[in-house]
């Protein structure tokens, strides 16, 4: 039965490729910036923007975006709760003197979809019973944290994303010398990678393979000067995670697409989380990365303020046409938000330089 419910390879590939489409320029810095700018107009959240792109903004079928299937949209619906319901924090006041000088944590968006896509989500969930829909859209709060339920395809995509985040991002960080042999091991042990834990991993591997390499040896090889050895170790970590993925049944849901979920078996789930913590500690939260994220936050906010101040002057012709057709101020702000959210880092930087930086930008330079 389970094999019949698993998504077609093309479908799950499409879900994986599509799930981050809504991320704005400069990653979380851009997301915080747009949520700050849109706090009085419905907010902003990257995953919610993905749903908006797929069903409205992408130019394939007028008014329906890429016109994807219901199951694909269910697969990318990570947080089935509207912004207005998920946002419990009181809005912080705007800072008109220096609008870009904000603390990221004050304007971090809730996990949600945008209110503009309520009808889309209603259509996505239409095949499910009222009870299933109610449980999915009203996730419980456990230990002060909202616990979201996922559909089967979403759980597979999330699992793949987590494995990539912890292993392939580690590979990139090692290549860039952001993570070294010297700083990796203290951070890994602090995250829970003790000798006893590594021994537990080895016991699991030994029970499955006649010939095996200890997990500590695999991790040490990540720092080999030989790139082939490093690649082989990365491949081994990915393989260990993949072969320990399982499907479990959540009895609170009736429909199998909601009741069945993919998960990573212990202790490999802990290993994945430990590697993820290393990346967060040594890379994501490092001052060098945070400096760039803050700079991106400033670029996005100042672009938004310039575009909303004089949209006819600064918006591209097609975008301005959409802007003037918007039914109210809230919808007009959303047009500006959509335009900026669709930029790459490079495009946003070039547009910023053209508008704000003397001696930079030219009418002959294409964006």
Question: For each predicted feature, which ranges?
Answer:
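Charged/polar positions within long, soluble alpha-helices
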Residues: 88, 165-168, 172, 243, ...
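Composition- and surface-driven signal marking solvent-exposed, interaction-prone regions
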Residues: 169-182, 253-254, 317, 352-356, ...
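Hydrophobic (often cysteine-bearing) scaffold residues that line and stabilize catalytic clefts
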Residues: 26, 30, 46, 156, ...
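Non-catalytic regulatory/linker segments of enzymes
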Residues: 7-10, 293, 321, 355-367
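Sequence-structural signature of the catalytic-core scaffold of metal-dependent phosphohydrolases
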Residues: 1-14, 21-227, 238
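C-terminal subdomains that position terminal phosphate/3'-OH groups for nucleotidyl transfer/ligation
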Residues: 196-331, 343
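C-terminal structured interaction module
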Residues: 314, 335-367
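A residue-level signal for conserved active-site and pocket-lining positions in enzyme catalytic cores
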Residues: 50, 300, 340
């Amino acid at each position: 039965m389970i094999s019949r419910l698993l998504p077609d390879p093309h479908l799950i590939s499409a879900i994986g490729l599509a799930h981050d489409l809504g991320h704005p320029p400069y990653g979380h810095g851009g997301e915080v910036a747009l949520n700050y700018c849109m706090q009085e107009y419905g907010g902003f959240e990257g995953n919610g923007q993905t749903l908006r792109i797929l069903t409205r903004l992408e130019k394939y079928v007028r008014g329906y975006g890429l016109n994807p299937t219901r199951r694909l949209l269910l697969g990318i619906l990570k947080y089935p709760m509207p912004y207005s319901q998920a946002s419990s924090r009181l809005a912080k006041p705007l800072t008109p003197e220096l609008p870009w000088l904000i603390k990221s944590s004050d304007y971090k968006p809730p996990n949600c979809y945008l209110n503009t896509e309520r009808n889309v989500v209603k259509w996505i969930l239409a095949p499910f019973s009222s009870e299933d829909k109610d449980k999915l859209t009203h996730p419980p709060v456990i230990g002060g944290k909202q616990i979201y339920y996922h559909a089967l395809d979403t759980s597979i995509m999330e699992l793949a994303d987590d494995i990539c985040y912890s292993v392939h991002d580690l590979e990139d960080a090692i290549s860039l010398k952001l993570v070294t042999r010297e700083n990796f091991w203290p951070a890994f042990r602090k995250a829970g990678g003790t000798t006893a834990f590594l021994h537990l991993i080895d016991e699991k591997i030994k029970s499955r393979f006649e010939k095996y390499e200890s997990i500590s040896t695999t991790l040490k090889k990540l720092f080999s000067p030989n790139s082939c050895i490093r690649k082989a170790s990365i491949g081994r970590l990915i393989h260990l995670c993949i072969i320990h993925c399982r499907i479990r049944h959540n009895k609170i849901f009736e429909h199998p697409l909601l009741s069945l979920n993919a998960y990573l078996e212990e202790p490999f789930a802990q290993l994945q989380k430990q590697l993820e913590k290393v990346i967060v500690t040594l890379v994501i939260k490092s001052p060098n990365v945070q400096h760039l994220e803050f700079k991106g936050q400033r670029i996005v906010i100042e672009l938004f303020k310039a575009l909303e101040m004089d949209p006819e002057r600064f918006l591209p012709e097609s975008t301005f046409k959409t802007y003037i057709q918007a039914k109210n101020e809230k919808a007009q702000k959303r047009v500006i938000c959509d335009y900026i959210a669709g930029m790459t880092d490079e495009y946003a930087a070039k547009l910023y330089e053209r508008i704000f930086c003397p001696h930079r930008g030219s009418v002959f330079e294409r964006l």
